[in-house]
């Protein structure tokens, strides 16, 4: 313990009355006296001044005065009840017992400005803004980048990621066809169609059926011979049963004379008939024809030479028109490029709208279902079912190039003409000087 220094116990307790004068801070008292003297010198002590000297009441009328709505009967009765409770004398209530576990606070009644606000009535509600019709298909849902972020691409990317507006990268979808997945049937195929639509629909199906019948008749007519009569089995049997029959045009005597004449001729020639040699005649050209031919050949040669000279002269002149030639070539190249772009578009459209050969089979479209006039019932209970959903789905997938069509397997074709291969046998090799056995 250091000598000459008093401890806390020796100083005395701070809770006693003797410590009040010892523990007072003189600096706070001096500051308050200084502030009061300064206020008195400038205009007066603020704590001693009245409210009228300190504040000014603004009594000018406001431009937009709030509209005070009229109170209903219920609101007027409630307001009178509240004002009556306020004007009544205050009654002291006994202090609640501390033994109760739950202390309930009394409801606070409106006082002062709250009563004036109730007299004025509730504020007029602002007109609610009408909600705009939101259309998913026409509204542009792409995220908008603020103008402050447009200058920096990294800031824009970061903004979209933080705001959760940037969509994740997804693999591209391959579109196989632009055709609709489900084809809606025409009005004439209904169970209760209109007369005009039904007639048009049935006429179209009848026309397709007539085309098929005509095609089959054409094939059948092409198989049968046109100018010959095909003999049936019964006609062939009758012909064989008749035996040998001589035509009435030829008689027996004529045939015997012809046979005798032929035998005499063969005896004279010694049994061999020499064929007669026919004289071959060839037309010779006259002198005038030869002169005309030579003159025509000479004119052809001169014309050919003249055209060659003209082509050479034109090539020599092309040196001085290089700009025009370049321009013509550029225009030709531009036109060729435009034509190629058009071909590419047509090719893409055909690929997405037409059938492709995905299998060995051939695509045959399903027949359109139809009902006869006596089968039209007018209600679904008595309707005769036609077609099948699975058949429609199968045809739809094949039409949209999503399913191959099976067919006969292609047979392996063997070449008729085989390649010749030269093979030199060891026993037939030529032995020359310097050869050795391997």
Swiss-Prot record:
Domain of life assignment: Eukaryota
Positions of the UniProt region annotated as Disordered: 1-23, 247-346
Record's keyword annotation contains Nucleus: yes
Function comment: May play a role in ribosome biogenesis, being required for integration of the 5S RNP into the ribosomal large subunit.
Residue ranges, compositional bias (Basic and acidic residues): 265-288, 297-318, 325-346
Family that this chain belongs to: Belongs to the NOP53 family.
Knockout or disruption consequences: RNAi-mediated inactivation of the gene induces lower oxygen consumption rate of the worms.
Matching InterPro entries: Nop53/GLTSCR2
Species of the source: Caenorhabditis elegans
Lineage: Eukaryota, Metazoa, Ecdysozoa, Nematoda, Chromadorea
Keywords: Nucleus, Ribosome biogenesis
Biological-process GO terms, alphabetical: positive regulation of cellular respiration; ribosomal large subunit assembly; rRNA processing
Name assigned to this protein: Ribosome biogenesis protein NOP53
Biased composition (Basic residues): 12-21
Compartments it resides in: Nucleus, Nucleolus; Nucleus, Nucleoplasm
């Amino acid at each position: 313990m250091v000598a000459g220094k008093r401890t806390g116990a020796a100083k005395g307790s701070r809770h006693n009355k003797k410590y009040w004068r010892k523990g007072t801070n003189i600096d706070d008292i001096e500051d308050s006296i200084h502030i009061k003297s300064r206020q008195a010198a400038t205009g007066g002590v603020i704590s001693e001044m009245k409210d009228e000297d300190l504040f000014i009441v603004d009594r000018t009328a406001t431009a937009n005065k709030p509209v005070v709505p009229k109170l209903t009967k219920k609101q007027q009765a409630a307001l009178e009840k509240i004002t009556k409770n306020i004007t009544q004398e205050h009654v002291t209530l006994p202090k609640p017992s501390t033994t109760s576990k739950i202390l309930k606070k009394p409801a606070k009644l409106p006082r002062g400005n709250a009563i004036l606000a109730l007299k004025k009535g509730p504020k007029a509600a602002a007109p609610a803004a009408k909600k705009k019709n939101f259309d998913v298909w026409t509204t542009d849902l792409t995220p908008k980048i603020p103008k402050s972020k447009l200058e920096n691409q990294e800031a824009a990317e970061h903004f979209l990621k933080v705001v959760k507006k940037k969509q994740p990268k997804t693999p591209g979808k391959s579109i196989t066809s632009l055709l609709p997945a489900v084809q809606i049937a025409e009005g004439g195929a209904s169970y209760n169609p209109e007369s005009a639509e039904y007639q048009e629909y049935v006429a179209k199906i009848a026309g397709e059926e007539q085309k098929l019948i005509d095609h089959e008749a054409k094939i059948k007519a092409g198989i049968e011979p046109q100018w010959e009569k095909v003999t049936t089995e019964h006609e062939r049997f009758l012909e064989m049963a008749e035996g040998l029959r001589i035509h009435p045009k030829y008689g027996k005597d004529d045939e015997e004379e012809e046979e005798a004449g032929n035998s005499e001729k063969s005896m004279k020639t010694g049994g061999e008939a020499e064929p007669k040699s026919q004289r071959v005649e060839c037309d010779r050209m006259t002198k005038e024809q030869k002169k005309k031919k030579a003159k025509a050949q000479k004119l052809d040669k001169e014309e050919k030479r003249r055209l060659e000279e003209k082509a050479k002269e034109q090539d020599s002149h092309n040196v001085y028109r290089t700009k025009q030639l370049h321009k013509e070539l550029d225009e030709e190249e531009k036109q060729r490029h435009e034509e190629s772009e058009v071909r590419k578009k047509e090719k893409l459209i055909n690929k997405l709208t037409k059938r492709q050969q995905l299998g060995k089979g051939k695509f045959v479209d399903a027949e359109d279902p139809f009902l006869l006039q006596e089968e039209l019932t007018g209600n679904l209970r008595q309707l005769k079912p036609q077609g099948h959903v699975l058949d429609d789905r199968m045809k739809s997938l094949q039409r949209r190039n999503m399913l191959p069509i099976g067919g006969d397997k292609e047979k392996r074709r063997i070449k008729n003409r085989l390649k010749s291969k030269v093979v030199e046998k060891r026993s037939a090799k030529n032995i020359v000087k310097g050869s050795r056995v391997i």
